[in-house]
């Protein structure tokens, strides 16, 4: 697939491993593609890897830190989830844990539960709310790994850094966009535009370009 500027857009539509948990001995260069924590479960997005390669990402699953999204002959592209400000909330009993998780669940917050603490992405209202209900939260910097990602509705969830929108607002906007694009296809899905025709398994376009991989990449001899 070609970008508007004419450069090649690579497609990432599956996760083929993880550079943190798996061992690779093929000598390929690991190249990161950076994601914010709230992008980890988006259905479709455009990203740029550290080497400048553009990607259309639609893996159909929540992306974890280190997930391998694409490979070439000499490179392995993996997800790097940026660290974020988190609220660490210590708990001292199962009763406290149950009460806290109930309160956070009502706010549709993504969270990570450990033996003696609960972690949620930072926003000021959540910080103040946990103080109000009797806990002693503090702000830390950490990776957003192993979290339970909660699907929030509009107006609920965590406020996304740098915006006045919540994770629920962003999810609803994505759904609304899909509703207004009835003929849209997932990135990497095989389909033919009206201006394309197929001969012996090769797609051709009126501008002379052709594709051997069902329209994912185009070139001209």
Swiss-Prot record:
Entry keywords, A to Z: Chaperone, Cytoplasm, Nickel
Q: Which domain of life is it from?
A: Bacteria
Q: Which GO terms describe its biological process?
A: protein folding; protein-containing complex assembly; urea metabolic process
Region annotation Disordered: where it falls in the sequence: 160-194
The primary site where this protein sits is cytoplasm
Which GO molecular function entries does the Swiss-Prot or TrEMBL record give?
Answer: nickel cation binding; unfolded protein binding
GO CC: one term? Answer: cytoplasm
Q: Where in the cell is the protein located? A: Cytoplasm
Family, per entry: Belongs to the UreE family.
> How is this protein named in the record?
Urease accessory protein UreE
State the organism of origin: Bifidobacterium longum subsp. infantis (strain ATCC 15697 / DSM 20088 / JCM 1222 / NCTC 11817 / S12)
Give me the gene this protein comes from.
ureE
């Amino acid at each position: 697939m070609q970008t508007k500027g004419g450069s090649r857009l690579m497609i990432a539509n599956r996760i083929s491993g993880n550079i943190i948990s798996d061992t690779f001995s093929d000598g390929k260069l690991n190249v990161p593609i950076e994601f914010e924590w709230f992008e980890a479960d988006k259905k479709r997005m455009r990203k740029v890897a550290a080497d400048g390669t553009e990607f259309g990402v639609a893996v159909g699953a929540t992306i974890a830190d280190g997930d391998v999204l694409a490979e070439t002959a000499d490179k392995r592209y993996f997800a790097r989830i940026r660290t974020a400000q988190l609220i660490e909330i210590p708990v001292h009993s199962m009763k406290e844990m149950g009460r806290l998780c109930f309160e956070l669940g009502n706010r549709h917050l993504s969270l990570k539960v450990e033996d003696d603490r609960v972690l949620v992405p930072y926003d000021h209202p959540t910080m103040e709310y946990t103080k109000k209900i009797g806990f002693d939260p503090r702000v830390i910097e950490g990776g957003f790994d192993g979290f339970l990602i909660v699907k929030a509705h509009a107006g609920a969830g965590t406020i996304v850094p740098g915006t006045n929108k919540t994770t629920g607002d962003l999810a609803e906007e994505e759904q609304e966009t899909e509703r207004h694009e009835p003929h849209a296809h997932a990135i990497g899905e095989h389909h033919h535009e009206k201006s394309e025709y197929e001969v012996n398994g090769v797609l051709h376009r009126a501008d002379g370009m052709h594709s051997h991989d069902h329209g994912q990449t185009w070139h001209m001899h």
